């Protein structure tokens, strides 16, 4: 049986290698240069901007290998102030290309690079190629040695969504992962992290949001048990404003979110609104000043203003390498909410993975 599993995994890895080769095949000469990175830096903020970096580092994986690519990516994000807030998003895509090497070298890699973005991407890709049982057996060890297993487990949720399991099936899978950590000090954070990752993973695909209102998404979250429901529901609120074509559409969605939380109050609902603000007005598209203005406009309309502020600050810090420093600047750019903003920022744990960052080298 063990030998058969070995052959199965080997076959899957070979298939992935062939697929990756087909996608990345190009000139035999190196396509990498500082000129190409400069083009990415000058690209218009948005999908073209992030896709440019994804292509660059995916190509580097093919030409220079996994370790060099990840080291260069890590160093570059530090040097360029987080690639204008898109670090976590790009790291997801990079992790998808590296997953088999990532798992083979996981003990040598700092998963906090871009707020666990690389490991989340690796998990998402692994879910496509491994059976649910093999997936759990293989990847739970990756979180065991992680500095913050709860954030790591969040990536399990993303992967479950990518595997297209139902809410009920996701509940069962998250339950199994929760059981693995039930005796750990940090267990309180694990259940919601898994269910939240799942719901966010669903919303990574624009078509998922096309025919769903917030109430429908909220009801679907009730498939999760009590410990996991809030994580799913918060993520539903958070992602509801994604993929809006203009400010008017975003305004309508955000007001709907605010009214929904007033009518269906559950723990962390207004924190979901704050996190949704960071989704609707992401750091790689708008200035700190613009985010501060949006925080004042929308958080002021909620029933729990400080919780809303905390959600925005927390998401910004999580999604970027330099988010904590920029969150301080955001607080200083507010007028009406400056005191509450400073207070909320001061309560964010000093152990936040990106409060301090250092370049990680794989040896």
List each model region and its residues.
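Non-catalytic tandem-repeat scaffold regions and their flanking low-complexity/translocation tails
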Residues: 22-363
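Hydrophobic membrane-insertion alpha-helices, especially the h-region
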Residues: 10-22
């Amino acid at each position: 049986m063990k030998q058969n599993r070995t052959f199965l995994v080997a076959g899957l890895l070979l298939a992935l290698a062939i697929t990756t080769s087909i996608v990345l095949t190009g000139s035999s000469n190196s396509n990498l240069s500082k000129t190409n990175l400069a083009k990415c830096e000058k690209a218009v903020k948005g999908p073209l901007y992030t896709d440019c970096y994804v292509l660059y580092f995916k190509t580097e994986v093919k030409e220079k290998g996994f370790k060099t690519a990840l080291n260069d990516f890590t160093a570059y994000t530090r040097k360029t102030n987080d690639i204008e807030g898109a670090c976590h998003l790009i790291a997801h895509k990079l992790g998808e290309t590296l997953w088999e090497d990532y798992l083979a070298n996981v003990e040598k890699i700092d998963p906090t690079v871009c707020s666990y973005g690389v490991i989340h991407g690796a998990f998402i890709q692994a879910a496509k190629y491994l059976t649910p049982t093999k997936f759990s057996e293989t990847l739970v060890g990756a979180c065991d040695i992680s500095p913050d297993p709860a954030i790591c487990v969040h990536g399990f949720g993303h992967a479950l969504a990518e595997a297209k399991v139902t809410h009920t099936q996701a509940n069962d899978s998250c339950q199994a992962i929760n059981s693995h950590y039930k005796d750990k000090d940090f267990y309180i954070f694990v259940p919601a992290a898994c269910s939240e990752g799942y719901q966010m993973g669903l919303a990574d695909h624009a078509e998922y949001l096309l025919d769903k209102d917030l109430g429908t998404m909220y009801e679907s979250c009730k498939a999760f048990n009590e410990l996991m429901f809030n994580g799913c529901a918060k993520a539903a609120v958070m992602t509801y404003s994604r993929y809006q074509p203009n400010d008017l559409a975003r305004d309508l969605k955000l007001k709907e979110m605010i009214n929904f939380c007033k009518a269906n109050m559950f723990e962390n609902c207004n924190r979901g609104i704050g996190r949704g603000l960071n989704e609707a007005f992401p750091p790689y598209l708008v200035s700190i000043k613009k985010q501060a203005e949006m925080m004042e406009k929308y958080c002021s309309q909620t029933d729990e203003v400080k919780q809303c502020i905390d959600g925005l600050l927390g998401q910004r810090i999580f999604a970027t390498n330099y988010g904590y420093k920029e969150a301080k600047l955001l607080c200083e750019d507010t007028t009406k909410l400056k005191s509450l903003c400073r207070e909320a920022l001061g309560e964010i744990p000093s152990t936040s993975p990106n409060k301090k960052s250092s370049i990680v080298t794989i040896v």
